[in-house]
Structures are given as C-alpha cells and as structure tokens.
C-alpha cells in the first residue's frame, strides 16, 4: 500500500514540485492538492490521506489555526513546510507543539531546483510521519506531569559536578520541552542535541527558556556548563562537552555530518563519555534512526547511567529502540517519568560525584 499524501500550500509552484517529488517515490502518492485549509477540509474527507503536508503561512485560514482544529477533530500525521524566516521558525515551533510530526524548510534560492534537491529529505520525512504515533491533542496531552517542577536537588555537589546529556529527533521538540519543564532551577547542567536545521534551534531554545525554570540557550561554544542551565546544539554544528581545568565547557564543531546528521547525538554522547564519564546521565528520546545508540554505549562503558524513552510515549520509537538493542541503557521509562528518575539517580549517587 502506498502512503497517501495530501498537499496543502497556497503556492502553485510548491504544490507542483511537491507533487513531482512525492509521485516519483515508489512507496507514496499524492491523492490531492489544496491551495488553502478550506479546500483541504473537503479533500481530507474525500481522500482519507495518511500524511498531510501543510504550509505554515497561508491565506483564508492560518495554518496553525487549521492544524489545531485538525489535531482536535481528526488527528493525523502532519509535516509542516516552513520558510527560513524568524517568523517562519517561530510558527513552526508552535506547530510542533500543536502536534505536527515534523517540518521541512523551503529552500531559499530558485525554489524549484532547490526543492528537487530536497527530494530525499521530503520523502524521508513523509515516510517517518506515516509511521508516527499520533495522539489527540489536549492542552496537557503530552506532559503527564509537565506542569509540575520537581523538587530542588538536595546535594549541591551533585548539581555542579553531574550532567544530563540528551539526544532526540522526530517528536523531540515536545519531548525535550516536557522533560526540561520538570527540572528544578538548581538541576545539573544539561547539554542537548536535537536534529533540527540552522535557524530553528535558536527559536526552539528561546521558547524553552520562557517555559522552563532552568535557563535554556542555543550553545555558542566556549560556555562554562553551569547548574540550572541547558545548552542546545545549533543547527549548523555538532555540540561537544569538553573540560578546561576544573570546568565543563561547550564546544562547537562544524565537521562532516555523522549518521547523516549535524548536529549528531553520537558526537555529543561520545564527548560526554570521554569528558564526564560516570558524572554523566544520558537520556535518549523519541526519534528515527540510530543516531545516539553507539555514543550512549560509550557513555555506559565510561561509567555513565543511561535512560531511554519507552515506545508508548515516543512519536517514533527509533533511536531509543536502537540504544536499547545495543545494550546501552539502564532504564526505559515513559517520558513523564524520566526527569524524576534522573534526579532520583543523582540524589542516590550524589556522594560519588567526582572529578575525572
């Protein structure tokens, strides 16, 4: 059975290019195209698509307004098509909160040739979306307890020496938000790699910073890693943990993609294994593929403690599944339980926080 795709975009050019890309794939087909959400509503009823691609900025009805109604009334996998503007990236973050599975950026230059170069990327995103676990959205759909912040870390030594190292991909923006919102202001320092293109990581970090008790920023490289702070890999670089004297520091590296990704979760996890050893706790969240599994195993070998998100709470159970398969994890738990388990581990092992 081919994946049935409905394209919603006000640009005839983009609709044509997307149709060409999707119909060129052996395992998917376009069952309808709509210039606006009003037309899309009828086509959804008629064609019953498996995946919807949705332009974030459209006339007649705002793409976000349409997405919110869709997720409430007929939840389905949606891939947003977004412009590379600051406004576009902010709207995209909101769309992911509302339940879109993923997004793909519109290329800047000559749109048609640029889009055709995106063929593999777009096709991959649609394949992943078709397999994604879509949950009806309620105001607190995902977060179990994301509204509650956990109690402060009891052992001050713990929070200054221990680190939380997080990797995620598809579905990860919401999972990371739900995880970080539970952390207390004196939580150990956090380093995060989320697969996301340049231009979107800053909007994501700014959004998290407004929502969380800890401070969240896009890593610039050279920052001292502090308790109560989270550092997000920028879309153009790998993020690494390094040491300078007694301090943990961030480092950016624009080396080639690893596992087809830059930033790569494996790069971050490998650096944590090397630099922090048993002071690091690794957390692998929802995402497609195997990025992070090998690095998480290195963290385990170096004495770190690792947790994976369970299948039921993942949008895509790929990266956690691979990490579990190679024997890299110590615990597997639902998303809403992971922050508590991490902090409980630190509380129980605080006296062992040691410089390496």
Curated annotation (Swiss-Prot):
Domain CheB-type methylesterase: from-to ranges: 156-349
SUPFAM superfamilies the UniProt entry points to: CheY-like (SSF52172), Methylesterase CheB, C-terminal domain (SSF52738)
Reaction(s) catalysed (UniProt annotation): [protein]-L-glutamate 5-O-methyl ester + H2O = L-glutamyl-[protein] + methanol + H(+); L-glutaminyl-[protein] + H2O = L-glutamyl-[protein] + NH4(+)
Leading EC class: hydrolase
Cellular compartments annotated: Cytoplasm
Enzyme nomenclature, EC number: 3.1.1.61, 3.5.1.44
Pfam families referenced in this protein's UniProt entry, alphabetically: CheB_methylest (PF01339), Response_reg (PF00072)
Matches recorded under Gene3D superfamilies: 3.40.50.2300, Methylesterase CheB, C-terminal domain
Gene Ontology terms for molecular function: phosphorelay response regulator activity; protein-glutamate methylesterase activity; protein-glutamine glutaminase activity
Cellular-component GO terms for this entry: cytoplasm
Keywords from the UniProt entry: Chemotaxis, Cytoplasm, Hydrolase, Phosphoprotein
Post-translational modification remark: Phosphorylated by CheA. Phosphorylation of the N-terminal regulatory domain activates the methylesterase activity.
Primary location class: cytoplasm
Catalytic residue positions: 169, 195, 291
One of the GO BP terms on file: chemotaxis
Domain spans labelled Response regulatory: 4-121
Sequence positions bearing 4-aspartylphosphate: 55
HAMAP family reported for this sequence: CheB_chemtxs
UniProt record similarity statement: Belongs to the CheB family.
Function: Involved in chemotaxis. Part of a chemotaxis signal transduction system that modulates chemotaxis in response to various stimuli. Catalyzes the demethylation of specific methylglutamate residues introduced into the chemoreceptors (methyl-accepting chemotaxis proteins or MCP) by CheR. Also mediates the irreversible deamidation of specific glutamine residues to glutamic acid.
Domain description: Contains a C-terminal catalytic domain, and an N-terminal region which modulates catalytic activity.
Name by which UniProt lists this protein: Protein-glutamate methylesterase/protein-glutamine glutaminase
């Amino acid at each position: 059975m081919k994946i049935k795709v409905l394209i919603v975009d006000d640009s005839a050019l983009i609709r044509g290019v997307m149709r060409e890309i999707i119909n060129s794939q052996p395992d998917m087909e376009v069952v309808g195209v709509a210039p606006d959400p009003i037309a899309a509503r009828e086509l959804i009823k008629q064609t019953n698509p498996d995946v919807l691609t949705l332009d974030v900025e459209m006339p007649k009805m705002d793409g976000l307004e349409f997405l919110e109604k869709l997720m409430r009334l007929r939840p389905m996998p949606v891939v947003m098509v977004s412009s590379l503007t600051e406004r576009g990236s902010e709207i995209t973050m909101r769309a992911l909160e509302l339940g879109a599975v993923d997004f793909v950026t519109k290329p800047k230059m000559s749109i048609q040739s640029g889009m055709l170069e995106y063929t593999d990327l777009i096709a991959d995103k649609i394949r992943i979306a078709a397999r994604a676990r879509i949950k009806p959205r309620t105001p607190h759909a995902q977060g179990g307890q994301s509204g509650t912040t956990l109690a402060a870390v009891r052992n001050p030594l713990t929070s200054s020496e221990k680190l939380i190292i997080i990797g995620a991909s598809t579905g990860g923006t919401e999972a990371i938000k739900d995880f970080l919102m539970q952390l207390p202001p004196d939580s150990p320092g956090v380093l995060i790699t989320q697969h996301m293109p340049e231009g979107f990581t800053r909007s994501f970090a700014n959004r998290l910073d407004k929502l969380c008790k800890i401070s969240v920023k896009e890593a610039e490289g050279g920052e001292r890693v502090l308790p109560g702070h989270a550092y997000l890999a920028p879309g153009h670089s790998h993020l690494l943990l390094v040491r300078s004297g007694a301090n943990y520091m961030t480092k950016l590296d624009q080396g080639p993609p690893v596992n087809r990704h830059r930033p790569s979760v494996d790069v971050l996890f490998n650096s944590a294994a090397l630099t922090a050893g048993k002071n690091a706790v690794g957390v692998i969240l929802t995402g497609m593929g195997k990025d992070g599994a090998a690095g998480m195993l290195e963290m385990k070998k170096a004495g770190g403690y690792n947790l994976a998100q369970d299948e039921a709470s993942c949008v895509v159970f790929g990266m956690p599944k691979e990490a579990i398969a190679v024997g890299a994890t110590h615990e597997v738990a639902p998303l809403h339980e992971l922050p508590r388990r991490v902090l409980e581990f630190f509380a129980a092992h605080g006296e062992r926080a040691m410089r390496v």
